[in-house]
Design a protein with these regions (language model features):
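Hydrophobic beta-strand-centered segment that forms part of the acyl-chain substrate-binding groove
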Residues: 81-117
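Beta-strand residues in well-ordered beta-sheet regions across diverse protein folds
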Residues: 52-54, 113
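Hot-dog-fold acyl-thioester-processing enzymes
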Residues: 54-79
Length: 159
């Protein structure tokens, strides 16, 4: 996922509900596993992201709540968009570790929020932790994820 391209597409589409839906669909096509839960991007700016996840049967577990892995997927996507949107075009990131705390059964429309303070100069690989919080419609925090990103320069393309 090229951060510059993601932000350029968002700047064209993020201003309307239809555009945000189209952006979210395009993101799902580009990142199929993350797209499998059907989350929608509602806010995106360098270093910050907000997603919503409608409560649908396909993301439920046997307890009629949203499955733990769907919550991890949502947290990772929010942290990734927040992190990558703040990186320079010469950098890239990949998840190396995820921790998730589940605080309440997740039911109803969920909102995931993440803020990342991207490292300044990226001239070597480094570890960077980004937190993503997930809230239910009542505003109660249902889960929080801590996602460890390895951030580094993109390899130079040999001609």
């Amino acid at each position: 996922m090229d951060p510059t391209r993601v932000m350029a597409v968002w700047s064209r589409l993020g201003g309307s509900a239809l555009g945000r839906r189209l952006f979210s669909m395009m993101l799902g096509w580009g990142v199929p596993y993350s797209g499998s839960i059907g989350a929608r991007v509602t806010q995106l700016a360098p270093g910050t992201c907000e997603l919503v996840l409608p409560d649908r049967r396909r993301v439920h577990n046997h307890l009629n709540s949203i499955h733990a892995i769907a919550l991890i997927n949502l947290a990772e996507l929010a942290s990734g968009l927040a992190m990558l949107s703040g990186l320079p075009p010469t950098a890239r990131g990949i998840v190396t570790h995820i921790e998730m705390d589940y605080e309440k059964k997740a039911r109803g429309m969920l909102t995931a929020r993440s803020t990342a303070c991207a490292p300044g100069l990226i001239d070597c690989d480094m570890q960077h932790t980004v937190e993503a919080e997930i809230f239910d419609a009542e505003g109660d925090r249902v889960a929080v994820g801590r996602i460890l990103w390895q951030v580094g320069p993109k390899p130079e393309v040999q001609a």
